[in-house]
Regions:
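N-terminal amphipathic/basic leader segments beginning at the initiator methionine
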Residues: 1-37
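Glycine-rich phosphate/diphosphate-binding loops that line cofactor/substrate pockets in enzymes
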Residues: 42-58, 81-82
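Short glycine-rich or small-residue beta-strand-to-loop segments that form or flank ligand, phosphate
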Residues: 56-65, 88-95
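Short glycine/serine/threonine-rich phosphate/pyrophosphate-binding segments
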Residues: 66-73, 98-99, 161-164
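Short connector loops at secondary-structure junctions
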Residues: 90-106
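An acidic, phosphate/nucleotide-engaging active-site surface
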Residues: 103-168
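Gly/Ser/Thr-rich active-site loops/lids in small-molecule metabolic enzymes
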Residues: 174-176
Length: 176
């Protein structure tokens, strides 16, 4: 049975309302200089004031495509180095990249995140530290390399999960 016939049979007794094709356009402000905008915002960030000379800073980077991601990372790393900190990248992406250390480095590479461009190491490992338990009794773990850093800064795009809805879906909560 063809799809059309199936739908006609299923909807035979259903009265459908009239439909109209509509399109919604929203203004999307553009940053013309993302590096300058980020540097300006970080000047006012109280958390950045806590980072001192020789502190290690794990920059948690996910697998989501973010416009200007490498520029964002490059700017943040430059500011951290100016403070005398020792930044490094940790992949923060769950099962992406085949849930392997090299696979996750490869995902970052395809997003333009490389040790050569950013001048810092990408420290990828599947080792974790258990930091507690959830209210339901499940272990809560985090990347071991990030756990041992003095500070963690996630770079993330926050969006709804594509497969399910719930109070905790994807992205930033998983990264932390």
């Amino acid at each position: 049975m063809k799809d059309r016939e199936l739908f006609e049979r299923l909807l035979k007794e259903v009265e459908l309302p009239d439909f109209s094709l509509m399109e919604m356009r929203q203004d999307q402000p553009q940053l013309t200089d993302i590096k300058a905008a980020l540097a300006e915002e970080l000047k006012h960030c109280t958390a950045m004031r806590k980072i001192k000379k020789d502190d290690t800073v794990a920059i948690a980077m996910g697998s989501r495509e973010i416009n200007g991601l490498a520029d964002i990372a490059e700017t943040l790393i430059g500011i951290l180095k100016e403070k005398g900190a020792a930044p490094f990248i940790v992949p923060a992406m769950g099962s992406h990249g085949g849930a392997t250390a090299q696979g996750q480095k490869d995902v970052l590479y395809h997003l333009g995140i490389t040790e050569e461009r950013l001048g810092v190491r990408i420290a990828s490992s599947m080792e974790t530290e258990e930091i507690g338990t959830s209210n339901q009794g499940f272990p809560v773990c985090m990347d071991s390399l990030a756990f041992h850093a003095d500070h963690i800064i996630p770079i993330a795009r926050i969006k709804a999960h594509t497969e399910f809805r719930g109070p905790y879906e994807s992205g930033i909560l998983k990264m932390l």
